[in-house]
Amino acid sequence: MASTTTESTTVTPKYPIIDSHIHLYPASEVHTLAWFDPDLPLSTNQHSLDEYTAATTSPPELEGFVFLETDREHDLDSGEADGSGWAGPLMEIDWIRRVAVGEPKEGEGHDESHSKLLQGFVPWAPLPSGAAVMERYIEKAREVAGEEAGKRISGFRYLVQSKPKGTMLGEGFIEGLKLLGREKLTFDLGVDQHSGGDWQLEEAVEMVKLAHEGVDDAQKVRIVISMYIPFPRYLLCMGISAHVLTSNRPPLQTRLFLLRSPTRRAP
C-alpha cells in the first residue's frame, strides 16, 4: 500500500499597518520650523517620503500614514488680525497638497506613488483664538489644501505641551474645541508629563470636561491623545489615534513604545 505525504504550508498572515503619527518636511522649508536650530540635525536635514517609505519596506506591510503638523512658525495675534501669522502652517498644508496630488517640487523627495499612502493629515490650528477665528482659519486651510488634500484633513493640532498653565482652559480654546466637534474634526492633544509635570494631565482632564459640557454626544469633539510619561532613563510614549476611521477598521489604533529619554525632543 503506497503511502502519501501531505506537505503543510504555513501562511503568514498580513497585518497592514497605518502609521498614525508621522512628521516630515522638505529641506526648502526647515527655516519655518518653530524649533529650528542649526545645531540640531533633526531640524536642518530634509525628512522625505522617499526616506520614510525606504525605511518601512519590511513586513508588516505599510498601508498608509497620517501626517501631523510639525510646529511651523506662527503668530496668533497677527493671524487673528489679518491671517499673516498663519503663513508657516499654510505653507505646510500646501506641501501636503503636493503630496496628495503627486506634484512635488524638485528635490522634495516624493512622487505620485506616495499619494495613496496619505490616509489623513492633521494641520496646525489657532485654537486659543476662539471659534470665529478658527472658522476663518479652517476655511483658509481647506482652500490651500484643495479638493484632493482637503478631504483628507482629519483633525487639527495646537501644541500645548510647552504652553503656560491655563492655555487649555481658556474660553477661546474651549470654544475652538467645540467647533471642531461640530465639524466632525478631531483635536490632537500632546501632554508632556515628562517635562511639564502632573498639572498638564490634570488640566487636560478639565479641558475635556469643559469641551464636552452641554454638548450632544454626536457633536462632542474627539480627542486624540499623545502622552509622554517619565520613567528612569526611558520615556514611555503612548498614542491613541482615531484619525483613520473606516467601516472595516476598528475605530482606534494604539501605540505603546519605549524610548531613551532625549535631551531635546522635537514636536
Over which residues does each language-model region extend?
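Catalytic metal-binding/acid-base residues of hydrolase active sites
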Residues: H23, D71, L159-Q161, D192, ...
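Catalytic pocket-lining loop regions of alpha/beta-barrel enzymes
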Residues: L169-P267
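Structural preference for beta-strand elements that scaffold enzyme active sites
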Residues: P16-D19, G64-F67, K116-V122, R152-R157, ...
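Long, hydrophobic, well-ordered secondary-structure blocks that form the structural core
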Residues: L118-V133, S154-P164, G176
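An N-terminally biased module of ancient metal coordination in phosphate/nucleic-acid-related enzymes
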Residues: A2-G109
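Acidic (Asp/Glu)-rich catalytic clusters
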Residues: Y52-E61, W95-K116, R136-I153, E171-R182, ...
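A structural signal for the main folded, soluble domain(s) of proteins
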Residues: K14, H21, F65, F121, ...
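Acidic-and-aromatic substrate-binding clefts and catalytic sites of carbohydrate-active enzymes
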Residues: L42-S43, H74-D75, G85-P89, A125-R136, ...
